[in-house]
Amino acid sequence: MRIDVLSIFPEYLEPLKLSLIGKAVTDGLLQLQVTDPREFATDRHRTVDDTPYGGGAGMVMKPEPWARALESVLRAGSDTTARSGSTAATSASAQQATRLGPDDDAAQPGDAGQGTAAPDYARTGGTPGAGRAASSRPVLVVPSPAGEVFTQEVAYELAEEEHLVFACGRYEGIDERFIEWARDEVRVRPLSLGDYVLNGGEVAVLAMVEAVTRLVPGVIGNPESLDEESHTGGLLEYPVYTKPAQWRERTVPDTLLSGHHGRIARWRRDQQLERTARRRPDMVLALDPATLDRADLAVLAAEGFTLRDGQWQRCSPAPSEQAPEGARDMA
């Protein structure tokens, strides 16, 4: 997978060099490049913003530097893909070497309109996205409080892509014409972390990139851990414990110490259902009843959720007024 981030504050993305993502880049599982649109500005002051038409507070990001920056990373990405495909066809042993890695070509400041164009650029007069099937085009993610909510499901969808580009807007946002133009070159996906506003897109991109890349095969050492996390299967994760068994007058639930795998699995499932019902009742209402067994339904009923004509009904009193979370132990 190749990931490009467009930001006028590239230092903000330094944490992506750390931990598992940094290791994945070193190992060649990911290619990660940060590009500053300021390097594509045309004036000596490298201006990337201006006042909004129609008046109002704040500044708006100018479209041309962003368009040039995007064109640059699309050329670099397409060139990498073309070379990878050619190398893979040469020999089976070369396939491993063609995985995207830190030594592949990447967008460099000021290279808009330069470099070796990929074949489809040459056929279409230098337009990065033209002549390419829509489903094969890179995805441009634009963090925005006006976008669709970024969820674990969206993370899984993005993890299937070969090339992601993130545009970190600032101030009042990027000129809408850039977004409209980009739709002819890439698949544009405005995404929001939630119902709140940040100073810029960098914080959101850090979260999104981590959520997406950890789903790429090989990035997480134990892929089975992904199956037990919150939001997998529509439920929150169960509580976890480690040694010592007793700490400051608090003990690990007896079931987890029993060694009985069936009881442990049931306890964890019950905890997932309880926690989801109390913290995220909206997720319970979205559960498919066909995926639940009798024991599941009993736990949810105790938390105030019952089925009527195949539809979830929430009873009173609210689950938060019931027994403390985690009080039930099956030992």
Curated annotation (Swiss-Prot):
Q: Which domain of life is it from?
A: Bacteria
* Keyword tRNA processing included in the entry's annotation: yes
Places the protein is found? Cytoplasm
Low complexity bias locations: 77-99, 107-134
Q: What class of enzyme is it?
A: transferase
Q: Sorted alphabetically, which CDD domains does this protein's record hold? A: TrmD-like
Q: Which InterPro entries match?
A: Alpha/beta_knot_MTases (IPR029028), tRNA_m1G_MeTrfase_C_sf (IPR023148), tRNA_m1G_MeTrfase_TrmD (IPR002649), tRNA_m1G_MTases_N (IPR029026), tRNA_MeTrfase_TRMD/TRM10 (IPR016009)
Q: Name one GO cellular component term.
A: cytosol
KW tRNA processing (keyword) present? yes
Stretches for region Disordered: 77-137, 312-331
Residues that coordinate or bind S-adenosyl-L-methionine: G169, L193, G194, D195, Y196, V197, L198
Q: Which cysteines are joined by disulfide bonds?
A: none
**Recorded E.C. number(s)?**
2.1.1.228
The main location class comes to: cytoplasm
* Keywords recorded for this protein, A-Z: Cytoplasm, Methyltransferase, S-adenosyl-L-methionine, Transferase, tRNA processing
Q: Name one Pfam family in it.
A: tRNA_m1G_MT
| GO molecular function, a single term | tRNA (guanine(37)-N1)-methyltransferase activity
Q: Alphabetically, which GO biological process terms does the record hold?
A: tRNA N1-guanine methylation
Reactions the enzyme catalyzes: guanosine(37) in tRNA + S-adenosyl-L-methionine = N(1)-methylguanosine(37) in tRNA + S-adenosyl-L-homocysteine + H(+)
Q: Which NCBIfam families match?
A: PRK00026.1
Q: What does this protein do?
A: Specifically methylates guanosine-37 in various tRNAs.
Q: What does the similarity note say?
A: Belongs to the RNA methyltransferase TrmD family.
Subunit structure as annotated in this protein's UniProt entry = Homodimer.
The protein's name is tRNA (guanine-N(1)-)-methyltransferase
